[in-house]
């Protein structure tokens, strides 16, 4: 085993941040980048008039709306570790992109608004992360506002998500009366609104503050000591094994907006979070991240990260070996050899050429149309295929045409590139070949329309055909006469036939009429 490679892998920390919209995910990402020395000041998403947009919200529509709709990747060095943050869309319509991103990380950070507690989108994303069995770290955000009692927030983790919460620090007051954090793990108090080393007060051996400190006489500090005592006696005990399996989550408190508690969280996170681990490939083989053969999988494709060049980037999570510029790889799906001359690392839309990357790193490959989401690539003689990424059956459908028939070329180009990103799905009417788009949520259509106009100068006309139940059919069983006004026959972008049923009743009617025909939810 290559010792140097093993050392590099050990330094990697690759994670995603999950939350409900507006819980402060982008703000905490910005503060981490600040500590990593990547940016000089954190851009606040809300301040749209100032033109200070968040670093991770790089696409035009995100800047206008203040929501993340694509996952972006940010990389930086911190305390001898290489940090790879994958920022994920908080908006529910973009769950496909988010779910795929969660397949490319080794840990997750869950950001919760301390006034609202666990919200629906957090719950959904938590389930995906839990299923993967990777560690989950929790940051209870917005302590600078009046919120719910910390004991309630910890209890809710267990009640709603079924995961044990173990407090790493504890608020002293909240909102207007916030004084600081009682840092259990580091045996100190972190004062609110203080800079530099002045903000830390060491605790006595018995966990109290020296009498000379004014805070020691504050009734709120006494309340905190009582709560800490209660948590120590009745709460969960810190258990590294449970954390590794995703059965226990270390809980940190703070305010990302005022940069309070974030550094303490980040320091603990890089110590506790895992380095890249083995992947299951080829069905049942374990592939070590330190395996000398390079391999990785495409979890995202993004068009127009640089609108001036109309490029496409395939995001690859490295699973094993070491990537070097000019590396020859094989695309597992086609067996096609590809030389990887141009690869890039990210700071949102800023890019630098990659000279080398190891397991845990995310590299962007310039794509001329070779790659699809879920593709595996490998450098050796042994074929390596990673498990398929989750796919979703759309529920909303729209007919789409170009407003200007003279601009068919840009219409088709934009359509194909955006469909290959996997943010929207394309179907064609079996008889007429007209385009039909499918999506998980309405916002995807709006983003599609906006990007077609903004990035491809192609205005589109969209007409809803509403909610539909999509079911694929074996081509050998298909008779086009099975189609009628209640079950539209279309083909997906790979040419596979499927029906879009008006509702579940129409699907049941079809089953009754053709009992021997097998329909499937997803190919």
From Swiss-Prot:
Protein name: Peptide chain release factor 3
Domain tr-type G as annotated: residue spans: 10-277
PROSITE patterns documented for this protein: G_TR_1, G_TR_2
Pfam families listed in its UniProt record: EF-G_D2, GTP_EFTU, RF3_C
Gene3D superfamilies for this protein: P-loop containing nucleotide triphosphate hydrolases (3.40.50.300), Peptide chain release factor 3, domain III (3.30.70.3280), Translation factors (2.40.30.10)
Gene: prfC
Binding residues annotated for GTP, in chain numbering: 19-26, 87-91, 141-144
Keywords: Cytoplasm, GTP-binding, Nucleotide-binding, Protein biosynthesis
Record-level GO cellular component terms: cytosol
SUPFAM superfamilies: EF-G C-terminal domain-like (SSF54980), P-loop containing nucleoside triphosphate hydrolases (SSF52540), Translation proteins (SSF50447)
Compartments it resides in: Cytoplasm
Organism: Lactobacillus helveticus (strain DPC 4571)
């Amino acid at each position: 085993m290559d010792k140097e490679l093993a050392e590099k892998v050990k330094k990697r920390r690759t994670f995603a941040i999950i939350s409900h919209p507006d819980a402060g995910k982008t703000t905490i990402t910005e503060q981490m980048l600040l500590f990593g020395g990547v940016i000089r000041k954190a851009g606040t998403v809300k301040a749209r008039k100032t033109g200070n947009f968040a670093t991770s919200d790089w696409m035009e529509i995100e800047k206008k709306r203040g929501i993340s709709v694509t996952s972006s990747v940010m990389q930086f060095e911190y305390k001898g570790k290489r940090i790879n943050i994958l920022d994920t869309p908080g908006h529910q319509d973009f769950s496909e992109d988010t779910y795929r991103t969660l397949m490319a990380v080794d840990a997750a950070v869950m950001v919760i608004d301390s006034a609202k507690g666990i919200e629906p989108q957090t719950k959904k994303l938590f389930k995906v992360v839990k299923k993967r069995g990777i560690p989950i770290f929790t940051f209870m955000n917005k302590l600078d506002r009046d919120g719910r009692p910390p004991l309630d927030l910890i209890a809710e983790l267990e009640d709603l998500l079924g995961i044990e919460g173990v407090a790493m620090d504890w608020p002293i007051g909240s909102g207007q009366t916030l004084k600081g954090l009682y840092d259990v793990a580091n045996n100190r108090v972190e004062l609110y609104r203080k800079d530099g080393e002045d903000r830390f007060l060491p605790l006595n051996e018995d966990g109290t503050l020296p009498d000379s400190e004014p805070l020691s006489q504050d009734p709120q500090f006494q309340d905190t000591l009582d709560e800490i005592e209660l948590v120590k006696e009745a709460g969960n005990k810190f258990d590294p094994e449970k954390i590794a399996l995703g059965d226990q989550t270390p809980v940190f408190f703070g305010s990302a907006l005022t940069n309070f508690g974030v550094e303490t969280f980040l320091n603990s996170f890089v110590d506790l979070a895992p380095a890249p681990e083995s992947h299951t490939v080829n069905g049942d083989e374990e592939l070590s991240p330190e395996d000398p053969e390079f391999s990785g999988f495409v979890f995202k494709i993004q068009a127009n990260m640089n609108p001036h060049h109309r490029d496409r980037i395939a995001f690859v999570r490295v699973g094993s070996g070491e990537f070097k510029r000019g590396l020859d790889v094989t695309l597992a799906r086609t067996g096609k050899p590809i030389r990887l001359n141009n690869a890039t690392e990210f700071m949102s839309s800023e890019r630098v050429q990659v000279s080398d990357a190891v397991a845990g790193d995310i590299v962007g490959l310039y794509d001329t149309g070779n790659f699809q989401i879920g593709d595996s690539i490998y450098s050796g003689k042994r074929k390596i295929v990673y498990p398929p990424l989750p796919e979703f059956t759309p529920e909303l459908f729209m007919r789409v045409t170009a407003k200007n028939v003279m601009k068919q070329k840009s219409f088709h180009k934009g359509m194909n590139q955006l469909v290959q990103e996997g943010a929207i799905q394309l179907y064609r009417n079996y008889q007429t070949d007209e385009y039909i788009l499918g999506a998980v949520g309405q916002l995807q259509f709006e983003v599609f329309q906006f990007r077609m106009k903004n990035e491809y100068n192609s205005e589109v006309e969209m007409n809803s055909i509403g909610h539909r139940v999509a079911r694929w059919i074996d081509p050998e069983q298909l008779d086009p006469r099975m189609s009628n006004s209640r079950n539209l026959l279309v083909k997906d972008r790979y040419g596979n036939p499927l029906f879009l049923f008006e509702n579940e009743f129409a699907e049941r009617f079809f089953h009754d009429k053709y009992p021997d025909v097998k329909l499937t939810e997803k190919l």
